[in-house]
């Protein structure tokens, strides 16, 4: 049986622990792993177009719908129909919003294996030295965009020449995604509806205001570096080296930060805009799917059940590499033990249930290309965010309406 996934070296090691645990339980099923290249969607498309689709595939929330629409992925409901007990246990232990992320046109095309939403890392030492109160460590506690900006300003330091020696905020995620997160946290979802949307909310004033606030962090308020200002050092390195007080990112950064032995950090919730109602993250997630053309569906099914079920999720919890998708695993002592450097563990354990869904559509690759071109000038400060209402919104909606 072949298993296709994407991973950096640390992630690959943790995934192989799941594979090893599976093979100890199922010695009759041999697993051959296939590590993706830089573009996972293109890589798997080449495999499948050539008639060599892997039996089990890692699936991403943004791109799986296109594969499902083309018939590449098996509807797992066809397997669940014969496993009523497992189906009931999985649904009971799953966070509904994560599970439903992989539901498309009535089919269930993957089971979630992790939550990879975003939050804030912050440098405890820098906050203490500046006399700034640490940000909230629970999703039921809010802090406003104004409070976030005040903290970032207080934590930005300049030398006598005006050169910045310490930034208040850096972003280790994709900037245009982060900008839309700030729009979402101003009280507006990305799309209506979430699954198979026909419209993205670039015509909503509150959504646009959130994007503008994010762009202003570096262009107007100067509390975050521009792209050119961070060319000599990555945003992640700025944080790990103590040259930034806050960093937007996800759990995928934890392994890197944990290795920075001189860094005293914790995590916090994202700020909420004036039109927002509660602190929210995004439903970032990956799952495991089965190729519809697989000649080894039975073996693939056993692996997917294992990896996304209680035993495999417990292995993931012990590694500390992912935030497991099952409640039992994410709330386990083993998961907490793997995160001893984090005090605000509730940001992770409560993240999946305090996350807003991002759009699920087969057209997402085309939308990303449009956003990349149109959001760039806004994030660089050469255009206002309101220009997206007429400049980007109609283009995206046209793509969504075109089969």
Language-model segments: which ranges?
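Short, solvent-exposed loop/beta-turn-alpha elements that line the ligand-binding surface or hinge
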Residues: 77-93, 137-141, 159-161, 165-168, ...
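Glycine-centered hinge/linker elements that transmit conformational signals in sensory
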Residues: 150-153, 196-228, 270
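Conserved N-terminal structural module of periplasmic/extracytoplasmic solute-binding proteins
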Residues: 1-72, 82-91, 134, 228, ...
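Extracytoplasmic/periplasmic solute-binding protein
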Residues: 103-113, 118, 128, 144-199, ...
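Long, aromatic- and glycine/proline-rich binding clefts that accommodate carbohydrate-like moieties
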Residues: 268, 318-373, 377, 402
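Hinge/lid segment of periplasmic solute-binding proteins
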Residues: 62-119, 182-183, 266-268, 337-339
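Extracytoplasmic/periplasmic substrate-recognition and gating elements
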Residues: 20-24, 30, 106, 130, ...
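A structural signal for short loop-to-beta-strand junctions that line the ligand-binding cleft
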Residues: 46, 54-55, 86-127, 277-280, ...
């Amino acid at each position: 049986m072949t298993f296709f996934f994407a991973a950096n070296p640390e992630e690959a090691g943790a995934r192989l622990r799941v594979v090893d645990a599976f093979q100890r339980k199922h010695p009759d099923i041999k697993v051959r792993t296939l590590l993706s290249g830089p573009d996972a969607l293109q890589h798997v498309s080449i495999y499948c177009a050539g008639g060599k689709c892997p039996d089990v595939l890692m699936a991403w929330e943004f791109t799986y719908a296109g594969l499902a629409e083309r018939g590449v992925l098996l509807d797992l409901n066809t397997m669940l129909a014969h496993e009523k007990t497992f189906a009931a246990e999985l649904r009971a232990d799953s966070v509904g919003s994560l599970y439903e992320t992989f539901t498309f046109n009535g089919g269930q095309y993957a089971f979630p294996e992790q939550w990879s939403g975003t939050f804030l890392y912050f440098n405890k030492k820098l906050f203490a030295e500046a006399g700034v109160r640490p940000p909230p460590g629970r999703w039921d506690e809010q802090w406003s965009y104004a409070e976030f900006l005040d903290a970032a300003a207080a934590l930005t330091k300049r030398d006598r020449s005006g050169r910045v020696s310490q930034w208040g905020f850096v972003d280790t995620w994709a900037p245009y995604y982060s900008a839309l997160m700030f729009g979402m946290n101003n009280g507006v979802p990305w799309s209506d509806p979430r699954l198979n949307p026909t419209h993205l909310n670039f015509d909503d004033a509150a959504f646009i205001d959130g994007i503008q606030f994010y762009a202003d962090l570096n262009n107007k308020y100067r509390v975050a570096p521009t792209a050119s200002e961070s060319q000599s050092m990555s945003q992640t390195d700025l944080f790990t080296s103590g040259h930034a007080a806050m960093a937007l990112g996800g759990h995928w950064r934890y392994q890197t930060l944990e290795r920075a032995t001189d860094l005293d950090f914790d995590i916090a919730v994202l700020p909420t805009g004036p039109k927002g109602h509660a602190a929210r993250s995004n439903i970032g997630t990956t799952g495991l799917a089965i190729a519809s053309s697989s000649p080894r569906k039975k073996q693939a099914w056993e692996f997917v059940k294992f990896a996304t079920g209680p035993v495999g999720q417990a292995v993931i919890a012990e590694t500390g590499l992912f935030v497991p998708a099952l409640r039992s695993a994410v709330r386990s002592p083993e998961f907490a033990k793997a995160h001893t450097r984090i005090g605000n563990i509730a940001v992770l354990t409560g993240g999946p249930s305090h996350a807003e869904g991002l759009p699920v559509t087969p057209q997402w690759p085309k939308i990303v290309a449009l956003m990349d071109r149109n959001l760039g000038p806004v994030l660089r400060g050469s255009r206002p965010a309101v220009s997206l209402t007429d400049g980007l919104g109609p283009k995206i909606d046209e793509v969504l309406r075109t089969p």
